[in-house]
């Protein structure tokens, strides 16, 4: 034991750490560690969500001309006080998955920076997203998205989803706002905070999740209370996005019934109503497991409708029959019959003219406006440490402070 103590003492003195043999090492690491603002210049604020905030930035390295999106995860708050209970489950999941995924149609994680009590994920920057593109084509007047653009967007989206599923990842939150497009016309699936590996037994949609997927893109099996689910939930969302690109508005725009608490999940009657008004009421002949869902009795109490998807397709000006066939296969009620991402990529819709392109903007005669960036954001002017109130100044400030007059 005495030899052990002498050895530890010698090691400690060698490191200059006194009683803590790793103190000097920790101090050296702290001195050499680059902070976010040491490496990046913040251009402006992009958006906020339940996870935190996203900023547009450029590298301070003169040899790096790229732009980046920096995602800052916020701390848990309780009233006016801020408590740091560690990194959230969503952040851990997104960091772990993004570090492993490598595909042209998945947003690339450049690096992760852990600084004081904040975690920052630095992603490649995309100038556009599908929500912005849809808005451009629907305001102030309706301008349909050209078929070659729409087809290329859909193909690249399916290609990214196929890659996720081949690597046993469910995205679970696909929607236009989470689907980016670079200035070079490359679609990027982003926001993997709700993604799950599906090689393990899956939990219910709400188990362990603070965030609930936007119901407009939620598959019917989830609305009916499915406890376990498959990659087919992502393909339903792709079908909804396809329809929205065609119509320039959500196909199933229901009103969400709010949860009273985490264990009492209400039946989303209005959302289900929007679906059956277009697809018709689901039947056990077409969906054998229908009666096994927890909300089956609630479904039986709803008014019945005949199938109306073809009429809806014609009402929005849809004329391509192969496009309609693909849409109807993505919006199958029975998840077992829904197309997989791989099968969808091989659909005849993509083999007929106009052919898909790796640049969704190819052949376009106009340019979409750049993403709106705000230089005013109260959060980036504040710093919070444990036991302090919001608004105190400190090193968490992502935006250079304005000079005091």
From Swiss-Prot:
Protein name: Serine/threonine-protein kinase SSN3
Species of provenance: Yarrowia lipolytica (strain CLIB 122 / E 150)
Pfam families: Pkinase
Family: Belongs to the protein kinase superfamily. CMGC Ser/Thr protein kinase family. CDC2/CDKX subfamily.
Task performed by this protein: Component of the srb8-11 complex. The srb8-11 complex is a regulatory module of the Mediator complex which is itself dependent transcription. The srb8-11 complex may be involved in the transcriptional repression of a subset of genes regulated by Mediator. It may inhibit the association of the Mediator complex with RNA polymerase II to form the holoenzyme complex. The srb8-11 complex phosphorylates the C-terminal domain (CTD) of the largest subunit of RNA polymerase II.
Domain Protein kinase: residue ranges: 40-350
Domain of life: Eukaryota
InterPro entries named among the record's database cross-references: CDK, Kinase-like_dom_sf, Prot_kinase_dom, Ser/Thr_kinase_AS
Biased composition (Polar residues): 381-391
Quaternary structure annotation from Swiss-Prot or TrEMBL: Component of the srb8-11 complex, a regulatory module of the Mediator complex.
């Amino acid at each position: 034991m005495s030899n052990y103590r002498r050895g530890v003492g010698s090691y400690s003195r060698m490191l200059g750490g006194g009683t803590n043999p790793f103190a000097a090492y920790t101090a050296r690491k702290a001195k050499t560690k680059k902070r976010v603002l040491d490496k990046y210049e913040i251009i402006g604020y992009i958006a906020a969500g339940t996870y935190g905030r996203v900023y547009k930035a450029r590298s301070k390295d003169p040899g790096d001309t790229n732009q980046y999106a920096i995602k800052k995860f916020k701390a848990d708050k309780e009233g006016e006080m801020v408590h740091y209970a560690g990194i959230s489950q969503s952040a851990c999941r997104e960091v772990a998955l993004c570090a492993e995924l490598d595909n042209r149609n998945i947003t690339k994680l450049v690096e992760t920076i852990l600084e004081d009590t904040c975690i920052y994920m630095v992603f490649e920057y995309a100038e556009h997203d599908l929500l912005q593109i849809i808005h451009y084509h629907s305001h102030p007047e309706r301008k349909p998205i050209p078929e070659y653009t729409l087809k290329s967007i859909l193909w690249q989206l399916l290609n990214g989803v196929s890659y996720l599923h081949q690597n046993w990842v469910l995205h679970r939150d696909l929607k236009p706002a989470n689907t980016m497009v670079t200035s070079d016309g490359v679609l990027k699936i982003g926001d993997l905070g709700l993604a799950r590996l599906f090689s393990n037994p899956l939990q219910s949609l709400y188990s362990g999740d603070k965030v609930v997927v936007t119901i407009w893109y939620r598959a019917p099996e989830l609305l009916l209370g499915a406890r376990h689910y498959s990659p087919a939930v992502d393909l339903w969302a792709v079908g909804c996005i396809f329809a929205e690109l065609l119509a320039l508005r959500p196909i199933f725009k229901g009103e969400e019934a709010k949860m009273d608490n985490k264990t009492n999940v209400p039946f989303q009657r209005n959302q289900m109503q929007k679906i059956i008004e277009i697809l018709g009421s689901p039947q056990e002949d077409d969906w054998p497991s229908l009666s096994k869902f927890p909300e089956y009795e609630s479904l039986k109490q709803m008014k019945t409708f005949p199938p109306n998807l073809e009429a809806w397709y014609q009402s929005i000006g849809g004329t391509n029959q192969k496009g309609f066939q693909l849409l109807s296969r993505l919006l199958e009620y029975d998840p077992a019959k829904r197309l997989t991402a791989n099968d969808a990529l091989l659909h005849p819709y993509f083999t007929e003219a106009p052919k898909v392109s790796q640049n969704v903007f190819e052949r376009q005669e106009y340019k979409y406006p750049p993403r709106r960036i705000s230089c005013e954001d109260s959060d980036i002017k504040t710093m919070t440490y444990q036991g302090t109130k919001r608004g105190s100044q400190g090193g968490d400030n992502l935006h250079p402070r304005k000079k005091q007059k």
